[in-house]
Amino acid sequence: MGKGNKKRFAQVKNRHRLLVLIWVLQLVAEALACYGIWELNMLPEKYFIILGAAMAVLAFLTALLLLPVRTGRLQAGMGVFLSVIIFGLSCAASWMVLDARGTIDSVVGQVSSKASAGVYVRAEDRAHDLQDAADYRFGLINGYEMQRFGEAVAAMEETLGTTMSVSYYDGSQALLNAFFGGEVDALIVNSAYVDIFEELDGYEDFRSRVRLIHEEKLNSWSSVLEGMNANKPQKGASITTDPFVIYLSGSDTRNQTLATSRSDVNILVVVNPETKQILLLNTPRDYYIPNPVSSAGTKDKLTHCGIYGIECSMEALAKLYDVEVDYYAQINFTGFETLIDAIGGITVYSEKAFVTNDKYQIVAGENTLNGAQALSFARERKHLSGGDNDRGKNQMKVIQAVIDKMTSGTTLLTNYSDIMASLEGMFATSMPMTEISALMKMQLADMAQWNIESFAVTGYNGSDYTYSAPGTKLYVMYPNDEDVAKAQAMIDTIWADGVITDETVPAN
């Protein structure tokens, strides 16, 4: 063989090796994408088979173009072009699957509530940490949280290496009066109570008058609620055939993480997957109902129940409507705003024109809103004649608009990365991954349309003592028993595989 022939043969051999390498890389990328999609477990089996078959056909086609030893330039070029495209798409699919898995792992199955005992001093105080306040007189609220706070105080005493001087007061008002009157130098309170303090006359500016110098973790109330639920039978139902209830909570946390706090959005999502029926049932935040952590059944605002953990709010609503609440989904206000921006805004209908507290103009009719505007629309109550009742209805309009937007067209695909980023750290659910996967598979398999109806119970304005702020009367809303009974009847209808429509939803 001449030198020229040897050189050409070597070139052909090297080119063939390169083409084989390109094909192998494509094959590996396809295999990894298929494995990731299979492991995510959200694609129905028939679609996964179709996807696998399509990838196999593409691999075979590129093999015909790339693997023959003697391949023409045009054929090789077409093969390389096609292989690179498939490789890129497979890598993108793998990245999306990994991103989805990371986000899902961060939000699924969370059942614990984070709470802390905050040590507060007056804004002008010299202390900047717990050590600076070692010799201070500390004030606590007497009563219901004594066990949890006793453990927190013991932990702080261990840190300080000394016994703390602690005085106890009957109720929030008495504690704050003593603190700002100079009887004690610092407060030890549940950090979530700051919002409650600002409901009290004379302390609306509480945040600006104090500084937080230390936080001590509080044990969860979950053990108390688990004890209450110990004798309940296990549901043992199929998520794709039997009705279930999700508690949707809008956390009153304004920062970038979820924490134990009041809940301004309290909606039960009653679902019958067999009849494709969903009921959004709103309960006003100030509804005056028994607080589950009170052994005596002392009444409280519904929003205050969130201070003791999301499980407490779930149990309070379960008792109100005499229904088992199976799961929760919690989103904080920051997450609510970023999610709406991630899907490109929403459109909601308002019966009335008004200006929100954040100075956004809402017109009578359709309104296209970004995240900040939608959040302001959902929060507003002071400029609405129906107050909390109207706010609850608007919150459900926003939720409905988000569902409509996310299930329409290519919203999920084109805004995928932003949606995933908006959920991480802002959203939590107790629904297991296996059940989320089952629901996703069911929906993708039948692509059914869901009938979504909404109902908001109403009530009567009043003033009364609450479990979370004993000794002080706060604004509350006494339940409208007729509305509660209507809501229970609608839940029973859905449970019995019945259907509710716009015509059958009771007026209120």
Annotated model-derived regions:
Residues 98-115:
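Alpha-helical transmembrane signal-anchor/signal-peptide segments
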Residues 1-9:
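Short, Lys/Arg-rich, polar N-terminal cytosolic tail immediately upstream
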Residues 17-65:
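Membrane-embedded alpha-helical segments of integral membrane proteins
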Residues 74-97:
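Internal/C-terminal transmembrane anchor helices
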Residues 58-69, 79-84, 194, 266-272, ...:
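Short N-terminal helix-initiation segments at or just after the protein's N-terminus
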Residues 108, 112, 120-123, 129-131, ...:
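Non-catalytic, solvent-exposed segments at the cell envelope interface
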Residues 32-39, 65-67, 89-99, 198:
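Short hydrophobic alpha-helical membrane-anchoring segments
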Residues 13-22, 66-82:
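N-terminal Sec-pathway targeting helices
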